[in-house]
Amino acid sequence: MTPEHLPTEQYEAQLAEKVVRLQSMMAPFSNLVPEVFRSPVSHYRMRAEFRIWHDGDDLYHIIFDQQTKSRIRVDSFPAASELINQLMTAMIAGVRNNPFLRHKLFQIDYLTTLSNQAVVSLLYHKKLDDEWRQEAEALRDALRAQNLNVHLIGRATKTKIELDQDYIDERLPVAGKEMIYRQVENSFTQPNAAMNIQMLEWALDVTKGSKGDLLELYCGNGNFSLALARNFDRVLATEIAKPSVAAAQYNIAANHIDNVQIIRMAAEEFTQAMNGVREFNRLQGIDLKSYQCETIFVDPPRSGLDSETEKMVQAYPRILYISCNPETLCKNLETLSQTHKVERLALFDQFPYTHHMECGVLLTAK
């Protein structure tokens, strides 16, 4: 595979290999055949980052080969959304002959939505001034004249210039309801929007008929907690990143959801609060004991759950675990399987044509 060519004819074969690999990894814990969710074969990534290479009067996007570290010129990127591909061409054309915009530009980041909005961030090794802003505004206006719904941001050391805003609003059809999600530049969002819809619908399916409340750790912008709110009496969710918490609060209001409470704290801190080890001012006014959480949802970073959080989640009758790293999931299952059994298993092909797998498990207490 090269950045400008996807082996789409090999899609089914690479997916079949992942199914076999996941089943093998899960064999000590479950003999379930994974429910398999396919990605679009191209234009599935809604965000992408590229270094910018200056070559005389020319400049272009590059990525680095993971093995050889050699640079690869990228003029089109079929893994990314069609809007990113349009913007890649338009941005280079707009920057190439403009000294204010091209000087010391070293990276461009793209974030797009299925609703055809984009935030483009230009990263510089120089101070950004009013002349830069004026030229960037002219570029933005030229892009919009091409019917590209785009917001531009300039970044340099300790500097961030938003020409309009640093977010876009995604609209996803999820099990018969349109969900609105504010996505903030430089914050985590699910990279494959089509796959995200399938993940949300799978999570809704495995939790239908749930009793009581839901606790979610690592909630981000509320991606899962807001979609799952319809299946539970109440949802209590934690997140540490300030921009993500702010986006989650916006998303609660935008979706007219009244049964979700977001707390800004780390999963490890919340574990201490639940266990009565420490008290936190951030929890004033929130009666943790009033929540009857029968289900806990975790979508941890690649490192998986730490040992204290492992112990904490074992106290819940049902554990819904979305993993971007099945190796750490299996490590966690060595502990979790002592008290819980795997009821559902899913493979989400979030990153086609790569080694990476995303998976989901529903665990119920033995």
UniProtKB/Swiss-Prot annotation:
Gene Ontology biological-process annotations: tRNA methylation
Domain of life: Bacteria
Main enzyme class: transferase
SUPFAM superfamilies: S-adenosyl-L-methionine-dependent methyltransferases
Residues making up the signal peptide according to the UniProt record: none
Pfam families on file: tRNA_U5-meth_tr (PF05958)
Function recorded in the entry: Dual-specificity methyltransferase that catalyzes the formation of 5-methyluridine at position 54 (m5U54) in all tRNAs, and that of position 341 (m5U341) in tmRNA (transfer-mRNA).
Name of the featured protein: tRNA/tmRNA (uracil-C(5))-methyltransferase
Organism for this UniProt entry: Escherichia coli O81 (strain ED1a)
Lineage: Bacteria, Pseudomonadati, Pseudomonadota, Gammaproteobacteria, Enterobacterales
